[in-house]
From Swiss-Prot:
GO terms for molecular function: copper ion binding. This is Cytochrome c oxidase assembly protein CtaG. HAMAP family: CtaG. It comes from Ruegeria sp. (strain TM1040) (Silicibacter sp.). GO terms for biological process: respiratory chain complex IV assembly. GO terms for cellular component: plasma membrane.
Amino acid sequence: MALNGPQKTVVQLVGVVVLMGGLAWASVPFYDWFCRVTGFGGVTQVAETGSDQVLDQTIKVRFDASKDRGMPWEFKPVERIMELKIGETGLAFYEAYNPTDRPVAGQASYNVAPFSAGYYFDKIQCFCFNEQVLQPGERVMMPVTFFVDPEIIEDPEAKYVHTITLSYTFHEIDLPEGYAALDTGDTSGAETELN
């Protein structure tokens, strides 16, 4: 069955809309994958263990903290700057405090500057991997374990980096279901062990 002019145009337009919707849907996971693989935009890498090689060359890591508008916590790095050898495992802490009278959940987003160093900044353990819930008046120390990959000295764009800034921004998120039930005093359906 042959399509006439208007029918052919409608089929082409529907095809374009479906194609654009598919590309829009696929762009978010593709961009996330691209940033993790290339370190684009200061996205860091995740490592299972520390580096096998430690160089004599040192690098400074600055720690920065901010909060999204409306996030009621106090949030700051315990140590503002740390100098370590490239490849050496570092341990830094951030402090968070919930001054409110209610539990507050948060999720940290992170970035590394300059962007060229993001690919070489490896986190072994980080509070940013999981959502955090602070009870009213609770103060916690949150660790991040990391190292700078020795391969940074081979990269023509990153080898002259002497200082890396690790920035975290905390965003308020909805309380997990078990915490929400405890907050309202309704224990029906609340888990006995909260993660």
